[in-house]
Amino acid sequence: MIETIKKHKRIVAVVVILILTAVIELICNFPAIRGGYDDLDLTKYMTVEEEGNREKYVISYSSPQKFYIKELHLSGTFPKEYYYTIKTKEYNSFDKESEEYYSDTVNSWFSDFYTNLNKKVTSVEITLNKPENAELTAVSCSNKFEINKYRVLFFLAAFSLLYCLLFEKKIYKKLEWLFAVYALIFGLLLIFYVQPVKNSWDEQIHFDNAYKLSFTKNIDWTEAALNIKNINTVTCNTKAEYAELREYMNQAGKVHVYTEKKENIVPSYTVLAYVPQAIFLKLGRIFHFSFSLMYAFGKIGNLLLYISVMFWAIKIAKIKQLFLLFLTLMPTNLFLASSYTYDTVVFSFFTLGCVIWVNEMFFYESKTSAKKIIFMILLFTIGSFSKAVYIPI
């Protein structure tokens, strides 16, 4: 039996990984499996109350029986972003009662708004100010069984890599390939999880530079691109709202706002770090991708550059390969490599340059290679272009 498992360990691993992922998804959906229900309409419990010289919507519902609310759903039209509060009488895993408060937002971009509550309650009260030109048309709650594709993809990737680390010992002889696979999988997950909004430090500035560089003479500014550049967005915190955001940005990506003429066709050396991102943005337009997909595609250019450079840094390193692997897979470095930024070029080029320097200084066989020294200087130079403060160092 054991020998058979060893012989077919990869097939067994696939089956086990699929089962574990399915079990986790079932556990996360356990409240829906045990007591699931479709939309419970709370609109009939909605009233408009006066508070001073203002009006507010109040939706108050209580039940003699405990019930599970996975998601709250509000529908309506609003002139801008407003907060609403949720008061619940809820029960924890030990059946201890408590009164809790939560808040979320509605906005002018969408007509449907969602809040993940995931609580067992006996009462819920939603309060939302009623400004001029605002209308709340419907409120409901639900506890539906739903497969979360993002969670499924994450655990499939995590378990697969865990299997490789524990049972595929050959991979330790090729640490650069372990890095490449890990960075590619989790980098892509980061890119497609974070949605078409600003996420990393100063990402709106870096996107602006990459977007401009992706055009030759005239820059076609769409409403969606300007939303990213100007950090004009709305608050989203659920899958359903992010789906609405993608649809909104895709439509805004078709709206031409104005054309900006480039002063210089030849790019400055300070923007060389954005070339991979600009190339992939350009390819996204050539292939007529939606704005959301094009925005993610531009980040893939940055990720592939990071993987390529650090792959060779780990591969050619004479010592401390495991340390380099740990360094390159640190969450911040991988997150930046999956974003719009110049830091990826700075970090990866400097790292590869340092590896070449260490190899030449401490592990040379006969004499120092002039070609490698020139290449090392070139790496340091290009890496310093975006952050000139490093040049004196």
Over which residues does each language-model region extend?
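Exposed low-complexity, polar/acidic, P/S/T/G-rich flexible segments that act as propeptides
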Residues: 30-36, 69-70, 74, 88-90, ...
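Transmembrane-helix motifs of polytopic, lipid-linked glycan transferases
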Residues: 161-165, 296-319
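Short acidic/glycine- and proline-prone juxtamembrane loop motifs at membrane-interface regions
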Residues: 339-346
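Membrane-interface alpha helices of multi-pass inner-membrane proteins
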Residues: 372-388, 393
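Start-transfer (signal-anchor) and selected internal transmembrane alpha helices
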Residues: 1-33, 145-190
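Transmembrane-helix signature of polytopic, membrane-embedded enzymes
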Residues: 289-292, 311-332
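Interfacial juxtamembrane loops and adjacent helix segments
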Residues: 215-297
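Membrane-interface transmembrane helices that cradle and orient dolichyl/undecaprenyl
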Residues: 317, 353-372
